[in-house]
Regions:
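General structural signal for secondary-structure boundaries
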Residues: 1, 50-53, 158
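Proline/glycine-enriched tight loop/beta-turn segments at coil->beta junctions
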Residues: 2-9
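Serine-dependent carboxylesterase/thioesterase catalytic core
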Residues: 10-16, 21, 30-40, 48-145, ...
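Short amphipathic alpha-helix
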Residues: 25-26
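Positions that flank functional sites
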Residues: 45
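C-terminal catalytic-base region of ester-bond hydrolases, centering on the histidine
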Residues: 142-203
């Protein structure tokens, strides 16, 4: 077992009601520091499709964008963090993703999901079968560099502590609004630091 400090392509996955445009500042910052940054629009982005179907879009994007076996890193914001986890834990992403960074992701659900009657929102309700299944083997994420970044003031992830997980690294930031997380300079620099962290390779 050894460590390597690779600089992989980075794929940014947005949240519900968002587009890839929400990562404008983060993308510019990372590109300015030498990263090959990718993002695309999940479709539909308003919760009509299940998160598992959205995760398939990551698979399709990766297959058409990168050569076979090319490792890459994932950054998922809000719902995008759960979609990214599903790709890693259920769709074979564990073989290619070396770093996964979840920003304000509802790992254990958000009570606000009860106010939106769609499949995607249902899959983000606390104690729902989808999240219970995904969290059943959350220790899988210990096989990669996993980082959770969250704010205690998050009014979209209720409770905000739903963004905490018992694996990987945790970064707590005093950002006042959910949507500000991906624009806040402290969060962007925390993402850069996590992307620079050496990965452990099992021989």
């Amino acid at each position: 077992m050894n460590q390597t400090q690779t600089r992989n392509p980075v794929v940014l996955i947005h949240g519900i009601f968002d587009t890839a445009g929400i990562f404008r500042l983060m993308s510019a910052y990372l590109r300015g520091r030498g990263w090959d940054v990718h993002s695309f629009n999940l479709c539909p982005n308003y919760g009509l499709a299940g998160l598992d179907r959205l995760a398939e879009q990551i698979s399709h994007y990766v297959e058409k964008t990168f050569p076979p076996g090319q490792p890459f890193d994932l950054v998922g914001f809000s719902m995008g963090g759960i979609v990214s986890r599903y790709y890693v834990q259920r769709l074979g992403g564990l073989d290619r993703v070396q770093r996964l960074i979840a920003i304000s992701a509802p790992h254990y659900g958000t009570w606000l999901a009860y106010f939106y009657p769609t499949l995607g929102a249902f899959q983000m309700r606390p104690y729902c079968p989808f999240l219970c299944d995904l969290n059943r083997d959350i220790e899988t994420l210990d096989q990669i560099n996993f980082t959770s970044i969250w704010t205690p003031f998050d009014a979209m992830i209720l409770p905000a502590s739903s963004s905490r997980v018992p694996v990987g690294d945790e970064i707590l930031l005093d950002v006042l609004l959910h949507a500000w997380m991906v624009r806040d300079s402290r969060c962007i620099k925390a993402v850069e630091k996590a992307l620079r962290a050496p990965v452990t390779i099992n021989n």
